[in-house]
């Protein structure tokens, strides 16, 4: 698509969202071959695809966050798409991430498009929710001082419990208005659950244990909480500046994957301690 993973203006390669090229492709053979599946979708950078797991296998319901376009929905496994932006107030919305709670409510993150540290400008990010399968959207108030939402996770056992990852505004040494925030009432009220890194890219809930959370950020950090965000421990191990996302290993709850910006994918123990099969970086020893 030509779009950087995190939509920040200084990283764009194009002057307008209309110049981005991309869309959705589908594979029916496990990823060996792919073909475009974009009927009804404008040329766009698709930043996220969400599948409704309750939809029938022969006609999957899919949602796409389209950079500069909004949200597209398909009810036939991606064969055709329709734009679903009723209630989204931004012009050319930078639809960034979608999430689905266990009760079927959808959430949409619209990315911030400005580096401005002020609140209330046209570049503010936003959070929306839909209770009717994306037919209409309602804006959810962000936590006070936040205008850069990045990621959203829901508790699989409590659909009203939301975790929001936010990117700081460019104010102060490390910025402000970032971290992780939690809501126990579907986004009506928020409280800060983590502020040790003001530039948090994403927050993840372990599907095997909803009390376990992971966070990844810019300050060379990955974090873990075992009590629903009350306390956090830094995960040692990944030696890279900009973490992207922490993904629990589906085959081993004691292991995680950590994706990064340009530093590859790391795999190791969730506590960060090296295991007997870890691969160590070789040291250069000239002359030996």
Identify what each model region corresponds to.
Residues 1-288:
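Extracellular glycan-interacting surfaces
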């Amino acid at each position: 698509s030509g779009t950087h993973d995190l939509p920040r203006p200084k990283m764009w390669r194009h002057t307008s969202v209309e110049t981005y090229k991309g869309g959705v492709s589908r594979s029916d053979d496990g990823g060996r071959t792919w073909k475009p599946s974009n009927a009804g979708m404008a040329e766009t950078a698709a930043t996220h695809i969400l599948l409704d797991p309750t939809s029938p296998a022969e006609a999957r319901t899919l949602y796409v966050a389209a950079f500069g376009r909004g949200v597209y929905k398909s009810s036939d496994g991606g064969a055709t798409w329709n734009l679903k932006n009723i209630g989204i107030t931004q012009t050319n919305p930078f639809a960034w991430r979608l999430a689905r709670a266990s009760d079927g409510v959808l959430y949409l993150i619209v990315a911030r498009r400005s580096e401005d540290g002020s609140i209330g400008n046209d570049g503010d990010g936003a959070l929306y929710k839909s209770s009717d399968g994306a037919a209409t959207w309602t804006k959810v108030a962000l936590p006070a001082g936040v205008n850069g939402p990045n990621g959203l996770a829901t508790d699989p056992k409590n659909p009203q419990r939301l975790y929001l990852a936010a990117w700081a505004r460019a104010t102060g040494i490390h910025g402000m208005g970032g971290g992780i925030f939690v809501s126990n009432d579907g986004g009506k009220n928020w409280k800060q659950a983590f502020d040790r890194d003001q530039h948090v890219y994403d927050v993840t809930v372990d599907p095997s244990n909803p009390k376990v959370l992971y966070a990844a950020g810019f300050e060379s950090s990955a974090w873990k909480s075992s009590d629903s965000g009350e306390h956090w421990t830094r995960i040692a191990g990944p030696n890279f500046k900009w973490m992207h996302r922490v993904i629990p290993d589906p085959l081993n709850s004691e292991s995680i994957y950590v994706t990064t910006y340009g530093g590859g994918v790391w795999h190791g123990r969730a506590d960060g301690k090296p295991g007997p099969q870890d691969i160590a970086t070789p040291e250069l020893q000239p002359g030996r």
